[in-house]
């Protein structure tokens, strides 16, 4: 950037020289009064040297050279954005007995690889480089704001903005720079969120622990005090608020009372600090979510590549398998056809053997049945013959008996009468004895089963 800044900025006898040592003022004072004799030292930069000049008394002020525009590095958008923000740091009151010493160290600058000196803060308020004392850090910002006020005023019409005296041209340039920086930052964050995350963390941690003061860019002396701006230009509301404050200053809102300026700046800076802390927390969450999403996308891309490789490697194997399957299926079909033919031939032979066996079984059964039938017919014939023989024998016997009776009847009947009478007497006697015995037995049974009669004889 084409910019010329005085060697040192004085405020009531206190200066911020270019050798890296800064002594804060004991009391806070506002500009706008009668100037005091001031001196400046020459500081060498990589591009050349600026001769020391002497500032006069009264209304003689330094004139700021117009900037061409901020040079941004894509690798560190947060550092450039934090360098462009120079507002609201003059209100916090630093204890009067404390001094902040800056020791210059070499560090990398984000714009086009320039190398300058980065001044680190040595103060009890900073613990382990990550828990700074707010009063300490913003006291350094107060000194830097006062140097800005000394270098930013012109002899012509002045505007009072938040306790600072700025010119109309500077105000217009400042608003344009803020808009350009916010637009460029939004584009870079959209295109490269990962690189912006790395640069944000690197710049925020380094500035948070050191409170750096960078000097020198392409041979031009550019002394800046880079404070712990956490929210950066990501919060568009702060940019709009700053532009509105500058526009109100153009309308003529002026405050002449120095004490009221200090109080207003004090509370405004406290609000800015709270807003910056909130915006930093939101920014951290958003960036962390973006990192997680990019990690997931990377994993998905790796999985997709692996799947495509597997598919591409599996395709020739599938083709080979198909060819092998086709050849093997053809040979298998031939083998199966031969097996089917053999099985059909065996089946025909088995059928023929079965038919022969069935015929043999049927013949045996028929022969057996025939033999049984022959036996039955033979028995039948035998029985019929026996029957005929018996009938003939009976008939012959009857004829013989009839002949004998006839012969006995024809004999003498007187001799036979006595025999017949004797036989009839005997038969009658037997029948009579049997009747007597029967009656006696019946009587005995009746007497035995009948109850005995009991006669009552009076005495």
UniProtKB/Swiss-Prot annotation:
Query: For the motif Nuclear localization signal 2, what are the positions?
Result: 63-64
Domain KASH, chain residue ranges per copy? 426-459
Q: Which residues form the signal peptide?
A: none
Q: What is its main location?
A: nucleus
Motif placement: Nuclear localization signal 3:
86-87
Give the source's domain of life in one word. Eukaryota
Q: In which tissues is it expressed?
A: Expressed in seedlings, roots, stems, leaves, and flowers.
List localization entries: Nucleus envelope; Nucleus membrane
Here the segments flagged for biased composition (Basic residues) are 52-66
Q: Where is the composition biased (Basic and acidic residues)?
A: 67-78, 251-266
Quoted from the entry, the domain comment is: The KASH domain, which contains a transmembrane domain, mediates the nuclear envelope targeting and is involved in the binding to the SUN proteins.
Q: Kindly state the subunit structure of this protein.
A: Component of Ran complexes at least composed of WIT1 or WIT2, RANGAP1 or RANGAP2, and WIP1 or WIP2 or WIP3. Interacts with RANGAP1, WPP1/MAF1, and WPP2/MAF2. Interacts with SUN1 and SUN2. Core component of the LINC complex which is composed of inner nuclear membrane SUN domain-containing proteins coupled to outer nuclear membrane WIP and WIT proteins. The LINC complex also involves nucleoskeletal proteins CRWN/LINC and possibly KAKU4 and the cytoskeletal myosin KAKU1. Interacts with WIT2.
Name assigned to this protein: WPP domain-interacting protein 3
Q: What is the lineage of its organism?
A: Eukaryota, Viridiplantae, Streptophyta, Embryophyta, Tracheophyta
């Amino acid at each position: 950037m084409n910019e010329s800044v005085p060697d040192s900025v004085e405020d009531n006898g206190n200066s911020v020289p270019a050798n890296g040592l800064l002594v804060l003022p004991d009391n806070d004072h506002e500009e706008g009064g009668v100037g005091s004799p001031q001196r400046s030292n020459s500081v060498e930069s990589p591009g050349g040297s600026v001769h020391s000049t002497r500032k006069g008394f009264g209304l003689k002020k330094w004139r700021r050279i117009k900037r061409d525009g901020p040079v941004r590095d894509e690798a560190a958008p947060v550092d450039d954005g934090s360098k462009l923000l120079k507002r609201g740091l003059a209100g916090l009151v630093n204890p009067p007995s404390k001094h902040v010493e800056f020791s210059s160290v070499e560090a990398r600058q984000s714009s086009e690889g320039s190398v300058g000196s980065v001044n680190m803060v040595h103060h009890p308020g900073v613990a382990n480089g990550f828990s700074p004392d707010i009063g300490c850090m913003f006291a350094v910002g107060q000194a830097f704001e006062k140097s800005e006020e000394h270098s930013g005023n012109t002899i012509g019409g002045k505007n009072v903005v938040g306790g600072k005296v700025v010119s109309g041209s500077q105000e217009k340039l400042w608003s344009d720079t803020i808009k350009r920086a916010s637009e460029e930052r939004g584009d870079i964050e959209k295109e490269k969120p990962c690189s912006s995350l790395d640069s944000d963390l690197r710049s925020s941690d380094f500035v948070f622990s050191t409170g750096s003061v960078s000097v020198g860019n392409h041979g031009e002396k550019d002394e800046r005090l880079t404070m712990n701006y956490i929210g950066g230009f990501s919060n568009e509301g702060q940019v709009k608020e700053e532009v509105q404050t500058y526009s109100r200053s153009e309308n003529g809102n002026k405050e002449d009372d120095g004490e009221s300026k200090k109080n207003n700046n004090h509370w405004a800076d406290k609000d800015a600090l709270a807003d910056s802390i909130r915006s930093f927390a939101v920014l951290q969450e958003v960036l962390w979510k973006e990192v997680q999403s990019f990690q997931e996308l990377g994993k998905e891309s790796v999985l997709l590549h692996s799947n495509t490789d597997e598919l591409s490697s599996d395709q020739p194997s599938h083709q080979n398998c198909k060819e092998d399957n086709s050849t093997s299926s053809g040979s298998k079909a031939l083998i199966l056809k031969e097996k089917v033919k053999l099985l059909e031939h065996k089946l025909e032979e088995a059928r023929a053997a079965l038919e022969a066996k069935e015929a043999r079984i049927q013949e045996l059964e028929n022969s057996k049945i025939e033999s049984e039938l022959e036996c039955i017919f033979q028995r039948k014939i035998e029985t019929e013959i026996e029957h005929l023989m018996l009938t003939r024998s009976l008939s012959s016997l009857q004829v013989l008996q009839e002949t004998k009776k006839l012969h006995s009847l024809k004999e003498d009947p007187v001799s036979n009468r006595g025999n017949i009478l004797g036989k009839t007497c005997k038969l009658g006697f037997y029948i009579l004895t049997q009747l007597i015995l029967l009656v006696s037995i019946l009587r005995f049974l009746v007497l035995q089963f009948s109850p005995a009669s009991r006669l009552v004889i009076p005495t």
